[in-house]
Structure formats: structure tokens, C-alpha cells
């Protein structure tokens, strides 16, 4: 885009309103679905059908405040403190193993005053920032030397071990794909991944085979109907919910499966209730919203690259990969395409930690967009000044 067009667009649209618009619709849909899917379980557990909705609204408010603060922080701050941010994440992962709250056999949450904080959500944003800084600093080496890529094995290996000890296989997988995607965008050759992914994949397969818990998840995912009232119960109920929606859904608030038939209907399996109430058309619209987020994040990243703002561009790419990958996995789990991962549907599922970190991630992307627009305007002013002289 010519500089003059860029300047005019930056003056008219000081921030990416397509991204803000898609996010606003997702938030609205998310609150609607948390309200609908949690009515029965809220009434049963707390005697208040709005309990989970009110907590989600509080988390959204907290996330918006955090996003506003992050939007005001220059990206140079994150570039300077990327290492400290990652170390804080590792320390929190150790603390959660010692002091964490165990839910459904996993120690993933640190009990705090306002919420149970899921540290793996913090690690996702910490990894994006750390990778952006590393790749910005070692861009040439990453493209030419396998050593520059394998150097990441130590910090991320420690992180992966701590995550798997919780255990949190889903977040480990998401973070691994984020790292891979950012490396590819930075120009790392494919052969580097063949040399690293194959041994890691072999190790993961061995972990699944030797763990009855993980093996049961894989078996249930492959054929949930073989045990519809036992290990396959949750997935079969999710599939029933999705199937009931047909083309146009049964209507907002009219889901049957949310009436204590489908466990975790307001968290990891909220998508199935959404599909039941909104149907295939609603699912297509939801997918379009996530693709819009991905496109806008990648567009912001590309424009940052065009201004040689590689750190900010990589953050935008990393956050885009994170949001859409997690959405795809969650939808796939609900539709029986992937084993259960324990991942939320971004901006939709109930969960304070996820909402908070996602808002911070999007705020960083908006900050990238803001600084890129400012750089374009400054460049155009310099050019006009030189022309007058």
C-alpha cells in the first residue's frame, strides 16, 4: 500500500476495528452461551442460575482492564523483559506442582484471591513474547543454522516437562505448535523440523502408550459408542448435542443436553451446546469469526514486518496462531475428531485465566498495530519534510 494511502487509513482508523468487531461479537456470543449452558449446573451447585455467568462477566471485566493497561505499554518493554517473563512462567509452573489445586486428576491451578489461576495460560503469552524476542534477535542464525533452533530445546524442554507433570498435554501441544509456526514464519527451513519433530513425536507416542489415563482418552475418542455410559459418555453426549442442532439449531436457550446430560457444558464442551442451539449455520459463522481474527492478526503482523518491526510482527503472528489453533482443537474435540485436551474455546468458554490471557494477547496485537501506524506516519512526515527542502 502506498504511503499516502496508509497515512489516510491510519488517520481514519487509528486501530483495527475489524479485529475489535470480531472480538466484540465473540465476547457477546460467549456470555450468551455461558449463561445458557451453565443454568442447570449453576442452579444445582449454588442455587443461583447466574453464578457462572456473573463470574464470567467479572473475568471479562478484569480482562478488559488488563488489556487497556497492556495497550498502553510500549512493545520495547516486553522485548526488554521477555526473558524475565518466561522465567516467571517457569517458576509459576513449579509452584503449581507444589501448591496447586487438583481438579479431575490434574494440578493446573494456583488458588488466588480472585480466581483459580491456570499457569499454562500465562505460559502461552510468555512463550509468544519470548519467541518473538529470540527470533527478532537471531533471525539470520535461525534461517541458516540448526544450532540456533536447537538452542531453544533447553528452556522449552524444561517447560514441557513441568506442563506434562501437571499433566496438561493440551497446552503442551498448543505451545509446541505456536513455537513451530513462529519459527517457520521467521524463515527456519523445514528440514530443521524433520530433525526435531520425529523424535519428539516418538516420545509423545510412547508417553500415551505407557499411560493408562492417556491411552483411555485415545481409545474413547476412536470409538466412544463402545462405552456410551462409561468412558465414552462425555463425547457421546457432545455428539448428540451437535447433531440435534441440524442446520439452524433448536434456538437460543433451548438446549436439552445442557440440562446435566453433558458434563463441562459451560467449559470445554460449550461448543457442542452452541452447535445444538445455533446449528450448522451458527457454527459456520463462529468459524468465520475466528478466521477473521486470524486474518487481522496476520495482516497486522505483515504490516509490522514491512516496517522492519519484526518483534511486533512475530507477536501478532504468534497470538493469531494461538487463538485459532486452540479454537480448532476445541471444536475438533467436541466433534470427536481429536482426543479430549482440556482446552477452552477462546473468548467463549467459561474460565477466568483463559479469558484474562487472551485479552492480554489481543491487546499486544493492537499495540503492534498502533506502533506500526505511528511508524508509517512518522516516515511519511519525514519524507514530506525532505521533499520541501
UniProtKB/Swiss-Prot annotation:
Q: Which GO terms describe its molecular function?
A: lipid-linked peptidoglycan transporter activity; peptidoglycan glycosyltransferase activity
Q: Which UniProt keywords apply?
A: Cell cycle, Cell division, Cell inner membrane, Cell membrane, Cell shape, Cell wall biogenesis/degradation, Glycosyltransferase, Membrane, Peptidoglycan synthesis, Transferase, Transmembrane, Transmembrane helix
E.C. number(s) listed in UniProt: 2.4.99.28
Highest taxon listed in the record's lineage: Bacteria
Q: Briefly, what is this protein's role? A: Peptidoglycan polymerase that is essential for cell division.
Family statement: Belongs to the SEDS family. FtsW subfamily.
As its record notes, the protein acts as a catalyst of:
[GlcNAc-(1->4)-Mur2Ac(oyl-L-Ala-gamma-D-Glu-L-Lys-D-Ala-D-Ala)](n)-di-trans,octa-cis-undecaprenyl diphosphate + beta-D-GlcNAc-(1->4)-Mur2Ac(oyl-L-Ala-gamma-D-Glu-L-Lys-D-Ala-D-Ala)-di-trans,octa-cis-undecaprenyl diphosphate = [GlcNAc-(1->4)-Mur2Ac(oyl-L-Ala-gamma-D-Glu-L-Lys-D-Ala-D-Ala)](n+1)-di-trans,octa-cis-undecaprenyl diphosphate + di-trans,octa-cis-undecaprenyl diphosphate + H(+)
Give the originating organism: Hydrogenovibrio crunogenus (strain DSM 25203 / XCL-2) (Thiomicrospira crunogena)
Protein name per the record: Probable peptidoglycan glycosyltransferase FtsW
Kindly give the membrane topology term recorded for this protein.
Multi-pass membrane protein
Question: Can you say where in the cell this protein is located?
Answer: Cell inner membrane
The portions of this protein that span the membrane are 15-35, 58-78, 85-105, 112-132, 145-165, 169-189, 192-212, 269-289, 311-331, 345-365
Q: Which residues lie on this side of the membrane: Cytoplasmic?
A: 1-14, 79-84, 133-144, 190-191, 290-310, 366-389
Q: Which InterPro entries match?
A: Cell_cycle_FtsW-rel_CS (IPR018365), FtsW (IPR013437), FtsW/RodA (IPR001182)
Q: In which pathway does it act?
A: Cell wall biogenesis; peptidoglycan biosynthesis
Q: Which PANTHER family match?
A: CELL CYCLE PROTEIN, PEPTIDOGLYCAN GLYCOSYLTRANSFERASE FTSW-RELATED
Q: Name one GO biological process term.
A: regulation of cell shape
> What cellular component GO annotations does this protein have?
cell division site; plasma membrane
Q: Chief location of this protein?
A: membrane
Sequence ranges on the Periplasmic membrane side: 36-57, 106-111, 166-168, 213-268, 332-344
Gene giving rise to this polypeptide: ftsW
The record's section on Pfam families has: FTSW_RODA_SPOVE
Q: What class of enzyme is it?
A: transferase
Amino acid at each position: 500500500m502506498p504511503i499516502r494511502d496508509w497515512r489516510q487509513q491510519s488517520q481514519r482508523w487509528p486501530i483495527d476495528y475489524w479485529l475489535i468487531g470480531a472480538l466484540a461479537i465473540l465476547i457477546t456470543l460467549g456470555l450468551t452461551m455461558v449463561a445458557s449452558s451453565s443454568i442447570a449446573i449453576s442452579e444445582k451447585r449454588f442455587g443461583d442460575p447466574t453464578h457462572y455467568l456473573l463470574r464470567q462477566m467479572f473475568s471479562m471485566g478484569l480482562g478488559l482492564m488488563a488489556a487497556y493497561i497492556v495497550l498502553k505499554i510500549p512493545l520495547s518493554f516486553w522485548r526488554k523483559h521477555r526473558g524475565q517473563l518466561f522465567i516467571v512462567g517457569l517458576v509459576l509452573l513449579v509452584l503449581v506442582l507444589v501448591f496447586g489445586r487438583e481438579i479431575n486428576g490434574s494440578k493446573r491451578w494456583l488458588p488466588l484471591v480472585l480466581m483459580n489461576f491456570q499457569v499454562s495460560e500465562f505460559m502461552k503469552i510468555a512463550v509468544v513474547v519470548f519467541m518473538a524476542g529470540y527470533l527478532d534477535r537471531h533471525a539470520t542464525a535461525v534461517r541458516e543454522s540448526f544450532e540456533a533452533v536447537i538452542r531453544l530445546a533447553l528452556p522449552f524442554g524444561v517447560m514441557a516437562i513441568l506442563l506434562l507433570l501437571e499433566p496438561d498435554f493440551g497446552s503442551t501441544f498448543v505451545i509446541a505448535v505456536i513455537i513451530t509456526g513462529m519459527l517457520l514464519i521467521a524463515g527456519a527451513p523445514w528440514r530443521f523440523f524433520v530433525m526435531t519433530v520425529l523424535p519428539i513425536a516418538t516420545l509423545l507416542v510412547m508417553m500415551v502408550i505407557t499411560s493408562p489415563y492417556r491411552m483411555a482418552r485415545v481409545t474413547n475418542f476412536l470409538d466412544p459408542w463402545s462405552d456410551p455410559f462409561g468412558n465414552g459418555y462425555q463425547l457421546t453426549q457432545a455428539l448428540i448435542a451437535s447433531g440435534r442442532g441440524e442446520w439452524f439449531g433448536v434456538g437460543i436457550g433451548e438446549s436439552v443436553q445442557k440440562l446435566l446430560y453433558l458434563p463441562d457444558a459451560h467449559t470445554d464442551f460449550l461448543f457442542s451446546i452452541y452447535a445444538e442451539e445455533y446449528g450448522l449455520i451458527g457454527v459456520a459463522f463462529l468459524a468465520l469469526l475466528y478466521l477473521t481474527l486470524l486474518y487481522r492478526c496476520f495482516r497486522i503482523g505483515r504490516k509490522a514486518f514491512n516496517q522492519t518491526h519484526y518483534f511486533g510482527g512475530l507477536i501478532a503472528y504468534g497470538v493469531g496462531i494461538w487463538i485459532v489453533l486452540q479454537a480448532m482443537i476445541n471444536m475438533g474435540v467436541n466433534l470427536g475428531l481429536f482426543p479430549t485436551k482440556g482446552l477452552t474455546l477462546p473468548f467463549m468458554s467459561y474460565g477466568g485465566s483463559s479469558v484474562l490471557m487472551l485479552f492480554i494477547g489481543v491487546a499486544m496485537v493492537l499495540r503492534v498495530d498502533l506502533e506500526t501506524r505511528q511508524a508509517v506516519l512518522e516516515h511519511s512526515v519525514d519524507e514530506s519534510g525532505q521533499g520541501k527542502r
